């Protein structure tokens, strides 16, 4: 058994391969000096169970955000922290965004939420922006924002939801 298979592809080739294989693209945005990035590559992505899960669902690629194609991708996807991971549809649109590394079990949960359309960052964010987010979806949305590392949005959404509650509900 092997770990995650990161393929040596350009971003365009990765999208094409994802279309061909009917998968999503998993993109690891890292830098050479980032400690958590190195930890993910050495201790998490090398696990056989990580490989089994990730390789089944994704065309996996990684790019150094300070070299080559990574420089443009960093701008295109507004990468502000390392590591940042994206789940990208074959049409190039982002389905889910994950900021920061973690142990495999936790990382797998975070990735799984992004695989599921209705708990993915893009879906929930779009519903929220359109004012169509159901009350029971707010907890999923806050989780997706946390996964994406968007702390200001987490605070705003929580304050908004709290503000909509009745006085009785606020105290229960």
Please give the residue ranges for each predicted region.
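Thiol-based oxidoreductase modules, predominantly thioredoxin-like and allied folds used
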Residues: 3-9, 29-31, 43-70, 79-82, ...
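Oxidative protein folding and maturation machinery
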Residues: 128-172
